[in-house]
């Protein structure tokens, strides 16, 4: 059970990082 929760937590962190990077790149392109 602990491995499943940690796996989902890792996926959540990766998703947040990728989304933030994508938003940052789009903002730089707009500027």
From Swiss-Prot:
Keywords: Chloroplast, Electron transport, Membrane, Photosynthesis, Plastid, Thylakoid, Transmembrane, Transmembrane helix, Transport. The keyword Ribonucleoprotein does not apply. It is found in: Plastid, Chloroplast thylakoid membrane. The chain crosses the membrane at residues 4-24. One of its GO terms (cellular component) is chloroplast thylakoid membrane. GO terms for molecular function: electron transporter, transferring electrons within cytochrome b6/f complex of photosystem II activity. InterPro entries: Cyt_b6/f_cplx_su6 (IPR007802). SUPFAM superfamilies: PetL subunit of the cytochrome b6f complex. GO terms for biological process: photosynthesis. The keyword Ribonucleoprotein does not apply. It is a single-pass membrane protein. It comes from the Eukaryota. The 4 large subunits of the cytochrome b6-f complex are cytochrome b6, subunit IV (17 kDa polypeptide, PetD), cytochrome f and the Rieske protein, while the 4 small subunits are PetG, PetL, PetM and PetN. The complex functions as a dimer. Belongs to the PetL family. Component of the cytochrome b6-f complex, which mediates electron transfer between photosystem II (PSII) and photosystem I (PSI), cyclic electron flow around PSI, and state transitions. PetL is important for photoautotrophic growth as well as for electron transfer efficiency and stability of the cytochrome b6-f complex. This is Cytochrome b6-f complex subunit 6.
């Amino acid at each position: 059970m602990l491995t499943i929760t940690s796996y989902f937590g890792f996926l959540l962190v990766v998703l947040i990082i990728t989304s933030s990077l994508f938003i940052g790149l789009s903002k730089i392109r707009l500027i």
